[in-house]
A protein has these predicted regions:
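Beta1/beta-strand and adjacent pyrophosphate-binding region of the FAD-binding site
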Residues: 1-12
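Conserved Rossmann-like nucleotide-cofactor binding loop
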Residues: 12, 35, 205
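Flavin-dependent oxidoreductases
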Residues: 15, 173-175, 182, 187-268, ...
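Glycine-rich FAD pyrophosphate-binding loop
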Residues: 21-42
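Dinucleotide-binding Rossmann-like beta1-alpha1 core, especially the glycine-rich loop
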Residues: 46-126, 254-255
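Short beta-strand to alpha-helix junction loop
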Residues: 62-65, 90-99, 137-155, 165, ...
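Helical element adjacent to the flavin cofactor pocket in flavoenzyme catalytic cores
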Residues: 137-176, 181-196
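C-terminal catalytic lobe of FAD-dependent flavoproteins
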Residues: 146, 281-356
């Protein structure tokens, strides 16, 4: 019998496991993959966001700003590599500049510090190989390795007594009651676990877990983003993430370039709604789009710089027809006692993981 069963061993589930491991609780994490951080948590740009892209008063804005401000301390505690590089959101047209000013004002409402609108000369001072007529400069944006980060939190939780059960996909949940307690019976493909509490951190499958307990109001719409990884020869020319002005109707922040903590460069992601939650394929059409759009901001890339490609899937609560973003859903359910439901945790989930916990 466990006090708490966490479903999902990504960055959110592992952050919660680490936080709860500080208390005298018997905790397990049920992860359907063979390791932690195999899905959304590990298939992204690895950016520590500042919080200017999110609507004021939203949970996304609140947790992103808090997560950014406190990340130096977290990185030190976990002994993980992290670099506060800054970030440029570059524009070319009058409409772009108006949007950048709006983003700056929104960020300041959210509590983001140090934002500036800068001209072309200042762009060249900060990142000489990035193109743009003007930009929003965010000095507090950073980069990290999401795998190393998530694994470090999971290892810390395990050191404190948390049990991780990998390759354990939840297939059914029943809520029974004995004379003293309400007990969840969680059936996986491998075993049956009993727990007093459940925390649903299942990411792409969080709606599926909710439906096992009668929660029908949420549907996750998988939105795939494809990336190229560039050789480290290119990495020395890009010292901070460079983004375009985002299209509010799209499911992401636009095709951008991000230096990795290891010295490579990511181009991407695209934004394409798909039917399957496990279709991590890549397509030539999208790869051509990455080259075209990425080259507008950073024209120094060549095909010989490409090492490999990959994709990730965003767990979006908004359908393709609606576009844009919904807020994080984090609920202590009144209709299901002892059940905490987290769903729609897309970007900036990586930045927000510790405050969410």
């Amino acid at each position: 019998m466990y006090d708490v069963a966490i479903i999902g061993g990504g960055v959110i589930g592992s952050s919660i496991a680490r936080e709860l491991s500080k208390y005298k609780l018997k905790i397990c994490v049920l992860e359907k993959e063979l390791d932690v951080c195999c899905e959304t948590s590990g298939r992204n740009s690895g950016v520590l966001h500042a919080g200017f892209n999110n609507k004021p008063k939203s949970l996304m804005a609140k947790f992103c700003v808090e997560g950014n401000e406190n990340f130096d301390e977290i990185a030190k505690e976990l002994d993980i590599p992290f670099k506060r590089t800054g970030k440029l959101v570059v524009g070319f047209t009058k409409e772009d500049k108006e949007k950048l000013i709006e983003m700056k004002e929104q960020g300041e409402i959210n509590g983001v510090k140090g934002l500036e609108i800068i001209d072309k000369d200042r762009i060249k001072q900060l990142s000489p190989y990035v193109e743009g007529n003007f930009a929003l400069y965010s000095p507090n944006t950073g980069i990290l390795n999401p795998f190393i980060y998530t694994i470090a939190m999971a290892e810390n939780a395990v050191e404190n007594g948390v049990k991780y059960f990998l390759d354990n996909e939840v297939v059914n949940i029943k809520k029974s009651s004995d004379e003293d307690n309400n007990i969840f019976e969680i059936r996986t493909n491998k075993n049956i676990y009993k727990s007093k509490w459940i925390i649903n951190c299942a990411g792409l499958n969080s709606d599926k877990i909710g439906k096992m307990l009668g929660i029908d109001e949420y549907t996750i719409h998988p939105c795939r983003g494809e990336y190229f990884i560039l050789d480290q020869k290119v990495g020395r020319y890009l010292n901070m993430p460079a983004y375009p002005v985002p299209n509010p109707k799209m499911g992401g922040l636009g095709i951008h370039l991000t230096p990795s903590i290891d010295g490579n460069v990511f181009i991407g992601p695209s934004s394409e709604y798909i039917d399957s939650k496990d279709d991590y394929s890549t397509t030539k059409e999208v790869m051509d789009l990455l080259i075209k759009d990425g080259g507008r901001i950073f024209p120094h890339i060549r095909k010989e710089h490409f090492i490999r490609n990959f994709s990730g899937i965003r767990p979006k609560l908004v359908a393709k027809e609606q576009g844009g973003y919904d807020d994080f859903k984090i609920e202590l359910r009144e209709d299901i006692s002892n059940f905490i439901n987290l769903t729609g945790i897309e970007s900036p989930g990586l930045t927000s993981a510790v405050p969410i916990a």
